[in-house]
Amino acid sequence: CKREVPLTDNESGQWFVKALEGWSAISNNIIVWDYGINFDNIVSPFPNFHILQKNIQLFKKNHVTMHFSQVNGIRGGDFSEMRAYMIGKLMWNPDADADSLMHTFMDGYYGDAAPYLYQYQKIMQGALLASGQPLWIYDSPISHKKGMLNPHLMKVYDELFDKAEKAVANDKALLERVQLSRLPLQYSQLEIARTETESDKQKSRELLELFEQRTAQFGVRSLNERNNPPAEYCVLYRKRFLPQNEKSLAAGAKVEWISKPEAKYQMIADEALTDELYGGTTYVESWVGWEGRDAEFILDLGEEKSFSRIET
């Protein structure tokens, strides 16, 4: 099910609702196991706080007496402390004022930084809904780089976090909480930067160093459900996405398909093979793929060139 709107408001969710209503007609002892985070990129923005209450109210209405909300509350996850707080409170009282719960948590947990982080949440939520881009549990920040994570909004988010850090600069505990909560934004900046050929590589290096230092400082052990650690991510990022001495001879080459990729890859296939950018860890991140058959294509380099090896 998509996660940018409640279960009742999207097609896949409505299939679930229909099944839930069927079960509730014959049972008052139902358990729901609800997935509520991005398992591919746990340390990335996942602004779904606005749907929590309606979904929990739906469960209660349909005789759900046991609710396991799997939101992977690991260190560094997107506002994982507040997510656990709000879900717990709404389980006890599905009719509580959800916005008031958010304010209560932020005021107590972030102190004077709270107003800026509240703005951050609300602006990103609005941008997500306005973009029309779905939010799902195997997502990538790259999917949202023209929507809620577009360049203008990323600048706004950075400014809000800068103000939040400044507001609690004299309180070590509060400052570290803000810095920990900033990691998902910084991770998304790194992920998007690696897909932009004209991105500021020195800025990416500096941000990567900060991300590496902060994840170690705050004990962030994993970035996804595969348990890939931040340190490994940073090593691979430097190797794959930051400039190397060697340039690809196939950069910008014309691609002639003998066997076309699967339909879901064709939109980016011509560029993805020759843009000198590595694909990410999931298929939505610049993969070009064939299923059940071999890849066949011609790369036209435009002129004769000498080369010593081929890598993919």
Predicted segments, located by residue:
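Acidic/glycine-enriched edge-of-secondary-structure segments
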Residues: C1-T8, T282-S286
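Structured mid-domain segments that build the active-site/substrate or prosthetic-cofactor binding neighborhood
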Residues: R3-P115, Q119
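Enriched - but not universal
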Residues: I26, G36, D95, D139, ...
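Catalytic domains of carbohydrate-active enzymes that cleave complex glycans
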Residues: D34, N62-H63, K89-I258
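Disordered, acidic Ser/Thr/Pro-rich linker "stalks" and the adjacent N-terminal cap
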Residues: K239-R309
